[in-house]
Amino acid sequence: MRTFTGGARRAGLAAGTLALLLSALPPANAADLAGGGPRWCPTVAGHRVDCGSLERPLVAGEPELGTIEVAYAVVRHRGPGAARGTVAVNPGGPGEVAIGKAAEFAAGLEGLEDHDLLLVDPRGTGKSEHLPCGVTDAEYRFGTRQEQRDAVARCARALGPRARGYTTAATADDIDAVRARLGVRQLTLYGLSYGTYLMPVYASRHPESVRAVVLSGAYPHDFDPLVRPSAQAVSLALRRVCERSVPKACDGEKAVRDLATTAARLRERPLTVPITAGGKTYRERFTEGKLANLMFEAASRGVGMDPAGPSLLGSAPRALDRFVKGDTGPLRHLVQEEGSSGGSEDQAPYIAVVCNDYRKAWATDAPLTVRWQQYRKALAGAGQGGFGAFSGQGFNEGPTDGGDVCMSWPRGNTARPQPTDLELPGVPVLVLSGDLDANTPDANGRLAAARFRGSAFFSVRNAGHVPELEPTGCVTGVTSRFIRTGTPGDTSCLQGLAPIAVTPVGR
């Protein structure tokens, strides 16, 4: 689910998801090897890189809507002889680029000297052909909830029937078309964040082409459309960071009470916070929903990447304490710091995929008035206890890929939701989750793992969204071993990562 990357999309737009960690790893020392392909083909030290693109139908079975170019890069293995396999990586989103992170991904999978790495930029992103709708990252991110819903409707109008071309199934089929062109018999699928939604769809549509699956920061296709696991995980993460802090920096129960008080005050009286991003200044109306987004999504990103350094999650207990005591400064600072990465990227690949595919709390074929009735009934039936420190309505105004944000996505010209009852192949599957991640919490990771027969699920202590970001190499060692052998081997290090630094509340 969505993660912002210094102005790019998540999830998925991620703070690079895996790529941020990988960019910190040492590059190969060997000279670059000559590859083949267009001028945009990336250079990866010590590896040959072959690139290309292929023309794909925008919407299968509707030739009148035209075609779209999908770009790919293959980072060839370093060792002698033929590759033992090919790993296809998707870093999240929807809409995160892959090819632009080729060097970082290759460094992160450096142990796989006998495997090739396949990177496909999803349609509408990176080196693939773009199909914009005129909604930017910053305006969507910083807008009020009504403005976000209006942006969704505007995006749909701009795309028209072409909106049907933005689906997870279409991206999965694009990847398989690339696989077929390359003559690769089977892929090991590696999905991060939204990639954990995409790769099972690929596996269900092309089971004979799947060798194994790795999912990191996972969630199931039939996830709760009211996002209750994430709401509850925010409180759990606050309790855990306080409990594990050395020396003890905060009281977890007090931090949760402070969060509830902050949410209630913002529900009644939002803040106005100026945010500078991309050379522009925006005035964000910081509501309970914006607090929810800050705490479940942004605060989960990059946790554990630098355990001793500052982080949003580690700073949150003190900021909440100060807010309750009348000092809004620390919380404002966190909002401004997190928002500074807002950018100008077009959000069509993000908005259209989540509004076409994701499960909703209403019938997508219902008229707008009925949708609102069904949504409000679902919220009322959920009760208040299921949303942790937040109100149900307030929390559901936080997700940019859920809650009520797709309410105005039209019935006409759009795709049917992605089916949730996937038939999946019986291949080796590894699922990882960070136990401080409220974006794709352990509860959702376990549900995602349960969809595969015989899968292995591991919760990584003191890690956030996409645990490969941790710096010791423990997690990437486990995943590399799994890709090579089909088993994770010794996983004891997953419970031994250092706790994150927490700003003392007393200061």
Positions of PLM-derived features:
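Secretory targeting and sorting signals
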Residues: 1-31, 54, 175
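Alpha-helix C-capping/helix-to-loop hinge sites
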Residues: 162, 245, 297-302, 337-338, ...
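Gly/Pro-rich cap/lid or specificity-loop segments adjacent to the active site
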Residues: 33-290, 352, 358, 362-507
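Short loop/turn hinge sites at secondary-structure boundaries
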Residues: 269, 318-330, 337, 362, ...
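Structural motif
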Residues: 274-294, 300-302, 340-348
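Short helix-capping/linker segments at secondary-structure and domain boundaries
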Residues: 297-321, 360-366, 487
